[in-house]
Design a protein with these regions (language model features):
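Single conserved hydrophobic/aromatic residue that forms the stacking wall/gate
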Residues: 1-20
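Cap/lid segment of the alpha/beta-hydrolase catalytic domain
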Residues: 68-188, 193-195, 229-236
Length: 348
């Protein structure tokens, strides 16, 4: 099984002991797992505006074997993802957007920029529940694959020792391109959200620009020194990703820490963290939250008891609903025409 060009232009194949490859499928979407047994190849895949189902793959194409979510999609709309490419510094970058429900070219709309984790992950034109909820509530939802993302080769993916540099600039250039493409986006009502590495980037962004009206930082990293010493990912990860340890180059770690720039932040920020997150310890959120409060920036910290780094994906259902409601309420307060109006998740 291999990926070609991007993580969402999937080519999957069987490789024989003689090196012969048999192409099974090459379509836009995701394949989260693939297995071969008794002459069949099956996997969990997502296609278009539908969530993941079980598929079988063969040289003749693919066949969906399950219809687990048809009742949901019979009563809930999901919009297709707009896709395009743009250039920055001679590098082609992938860009995506969901247009707000009932989009009217004569109106202006708020927007939310979403930043994926990893950074060795990738977005694509597939169903994403949280983004569809935001779209249904009247937002442009903008997302891209900056340098550091998966699917484009090792050179593109390698931002080690340079977190917050090319990746940050790519995201800012992406937003500029999206604003030029859709003048219906109200530049004064753009928010930014991200989790894990995406949370790191949100923390970094608020210390480097004031162009966002609000921010949501989830399961984030704020201090590479404390991250080195507390994360269950192991100390070798930060040493590799940042190119330093606390003992051979403390300055290098601090320079790549959003906390170092928190005194510059002006953006109202919501922090969401699992209380039992051992990948990015809850102290990462607490440090950034405390720094913003100390410097007089409006902020809110939500710690979810019993939840870990996987809150948004496999957390307790009631907690996942609460998380999404917290995000939507924060965005609505700062981005909607009626400040403070609570927004729920009952539409999708």
């Amino acid at each position: 099984f291999f990926k070609q060009k991007t993580a969402y232009e999937i080519a999957s194949c069987l490789v024989g002991s003689d090196g012969h490859r048999e192409l099974l499928t090459h379509v836009q979407g995701t394949v989260d797992g693939i297995t071969a047994a008794k002459g069949r190849v099956c996997g969990v895949a997502a296609r278009g505006t539908r969530s993941a189902e079980v598929y079988s793959f063969s040289a003749g194409g693919e066949k969906r074997l399950t219809c687990l979510n048809e009742n949901y999609f019979a009563t809930h709309d999901a919009a297709p993802v707009e896709t395009w490419r743009f250039m920055r510094g001679g590098t082609e970058l992938e860009a995506f957007a969901l247009l707000p429900e009932g989009f009217d070219p004569a109106r202006h709309y708020p927007a939310v920029v979403q930043i994926h984790g990893g950074p060795k992950l990738a977005y694509g034109p597939v169903f994403h529940h949280e983004m569809q909820v935001m779209r249904a509530q009247g937002y442009f939802v903008l997302f891209c694959n900056p340098r550091g993302s998966d699917g484009r080769g090792n050179a593109f993916m390698d931002v080690r020792g340079r977190y917050g540099q090319e990746d940050y600039e790519d995201i800012m250039a992406f937003l500029d391109d999206a604003l030029a493409r859709w003048p219906q986006i109200d530049r004064a009502r753009v928010g930014v959200c991200g989790g894990s590495y995406g949370g790191f980037m949100v923390n970094w962004i608020i210390g480097h620009t004031e162009r966002f009206a609000c921010a949501v930082s989830q399961r984030s990293i704020s201090n590479m020194v404390s991250m080195f010493c507390t994360s269950d990912i192991g100390y070798r990860f930060i040493a590799d990703q940042c190119g330093a340890t606390p003992w051979d180059d403390m300055d290098a770690l601090w320079e790549q820490s959003p906390l170092a720039y928190a005194h510059r932040a002006k953006t109202p920020t919501l922090f969401i963290h699992g209380a039992e997150d051992y990948r990015c310890d809850r102290s990462e959120a607490m440090q950034m939250f405390t720094a913003l409060r100390y410097h007089g920036v409006e902020s809110r910290l939500c710690l979810f008891e019993g939840e870990n780094h996987e809150l948004s994906r496999s957390g307790t259902p009631s907690q996942r609903i609460r998380r999404l409601n917290e995000i939507l309420a924060w965005l609505a307060h700062y981005l909607k025409p009626e400040p403070g109006k609570k927004q729920g998740v009952n539409k999708i």
